[in-house]
Amino acid sequence: MKIWTSEHVFDHPWETVTTAAMQKYPNPMNPSVVGVDVLDRHVDPSGKLHSHRLLSTEWGLPSIVKSLIGAARTKTYVQEHSVVDPVTRTMELKSTNISFTNMVSVDERLTYKPHLQDPEKTVLTQEALITVKGVSLSSYLEGLMASTISSNASKGREAMEWVIHKLNAEIEELAASARGSIRTPMAAAAALVDK
């Protein structure tokens, strides 16, 4: 068993980061996630948003793993459960693989909270528990997978910044469009007054 942990601070408010987290896939930084299906989404009586999603991924495999399972690429599935609590301003996301569970299990937990000293920033805490089963090289493979998770976490943070930039651009575009819509009738009204 291998445990991997990481912490990252986003220079964006919690609301922005959690919005981006829900729209993170697909993104060009991690093309291995090829599909996201929302299986269930509801708001409970206390106002928490619960989501259950299925992520479809496609991976190129290290040569040692290829020899074990006899494939160069493989499609895998991950189930993800998240809870967004707008009152406490926390988002907790838990994911686990549902493919190849007889060989490996990866249980990941991400928590997004406002930074204690600067509420305009958001702290992401990540942890993963990796267990390779029934293989004599399990500790080597667990280390290899931890390294892959670390690399993917970095790509995930880049993807979050990409989504946030995209969301901000969409908001600016909508605002500019709204300003233009308001000016056009006002300009027409002003022209009528001038006549």
Curated annotation (Swiss-Prot):
Organism: Mus musculus (Mouse)
Transmembrane annotation, as ranges: none
Name used for this protein in its record: PRELI domain containing protein 3B
Keywords from the UniProt entry: Phosphoprotein
Gene (name only): Prelid3b
Domain PRELI/MSF1: 1-172
Keyword flag Amino-acid biosynthesis: no
Family designation: Belongs to the slowmo family.
Phosphoserine sites (modified residues): S46, S51
